């Protein structure tokens, strides 16, 4: 490879073995870090070096300083939770360390899992990107939140019974919004989460793309409820 000195790459295999390489001709600051083989700290590498480790590989070039990659590595190593959330936290930490010398413009997040896409139709568990924005990491975080809302299943901790108070919050929407249908979601107030109300709420949620969070057991996803009400409040 005659262009080896201009390249930078990081890899982690299915067994957690990590490697990072930074070419000699990459622009300063340039380098990478991988998780330590003994799971304590991380291993740093500079230009012309291949470094080997475990669990993650973080690398960058044209950075303000090495603090960007240092922050990313430390954030990922210390964080818990889902992989998308940990990667998002690492991006934020990296930017807080200085980021790109040229400023901010774009950001992307790709997480692949077998059958992890919508309804298992593909392997793109998360595939979002921001091409041009004043604060691309903040915008990426907003898009990740939307992606999780519409494509991730309900967290059982977010379930709550549909009380008469919640029915009163949702019925005006179901009674007034046709959303392109020949009739409203509800034709008359129900006052309680009976079968008629639940069927109307189900159809409404499918229409609004909350497909993976639809339920018919008298409970509602708190995150969905908050999103529905926030959208209507913003529209008035």
Stretches with model-predicted labels:
Residues 1-164:
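N-terminal nucleophile
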Residues 156-236:
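Short acidic, glycine/serine/threonine-rich helix-capping segments at coil-helix boundaries
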